[in-house]
């Protein structure tokens, strides 16, 4: 519950569970897990992530961060085991793979994937972007959403720009009339 909620409400990559840090009471930060040509050898500071709550469950994201920070609620043991091995293995991917394995074993996830074509654990992260841009009365700018999710606007648009349709453009324009 905690891992799934943190990912879905904060738009985390699955493997970012390994880098969670709570600062200043209830502000959630994640460290960099991406290794590519652009950031090779660079020290990338942790980025702050923000909850986009479920309607009717306002404050749930902050509640989950508080649970995590308290230490009373933890991530599943198998995920914690992989987090402890990150430095030794020099990779984060096993954290996400373990979460995927854990989800695939649950009855509710099996039911959801059977009912929802194309649903994957990464859909939890994609939910954040969808809420940010398409399911809110106050959409978040592409630049701000991309920054919160830890990628460039180009990357953000390449993944999430396909959600544009004539109907969505018409609705957006109508809101500004």
Segments (PLM) and residue ranges:
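Basic, Lys/Arg- and aromatic-enriched nucleic-acid-binding interface segment
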Residues: 1-14, 18
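Recognition helices and adjacent regulatory flanks at domain boundaries
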Residues: 108, 121, 147, 172-175
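Active-site-proximal segment of tyrosine recombinases
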Residues: 16-18, 119, 129, 137-150
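Short amphipathic helical patch at the helix-1/turn junction of helix-turn-helix
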Residues: 7-9, 133-137
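Short, polar N-cap/turn motifs at the start of nucleic acid-interacting alpha helices
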Residues: 23-29, 138-159
């Amino acid at each position: 519950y905690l891992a799934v909620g943190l990912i879905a409400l904060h738009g985390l990559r699955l493997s970012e569970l390994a880098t969670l840090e709570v600062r200043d009471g209830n502000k959630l930060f994640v460290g960099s897990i991406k290794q590519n040509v652009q950031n090779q050898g660079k020290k990338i500071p942790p980025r702050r992530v923000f909850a986009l709550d479920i309607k009717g469950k306002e404050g749930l994201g902050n509640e989950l961060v508080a649970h995590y920070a308290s230490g009373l609620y933890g991530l599943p043991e198998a995920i914690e085991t992989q987090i402890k091995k990150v430095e030794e293995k020099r990779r984060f991917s096993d954290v996400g793979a373990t979460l995927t394995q854990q989800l695939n074993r649950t009855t509710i996830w099996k039911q959801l994937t059977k009912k929802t074509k194309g649903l994957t654990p990464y859909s939890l992260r994609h939910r954040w972007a969808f809420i940010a841009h398409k399911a809110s009365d106050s959409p978040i700018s592409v630049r701000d959403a991309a920054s919160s999710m830890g990628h460039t606007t180009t990357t953000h648009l390449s993944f999430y720009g396909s959600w544009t349709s004539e109907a969505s453009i018409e609705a957006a324009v109508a809101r500004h009339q």
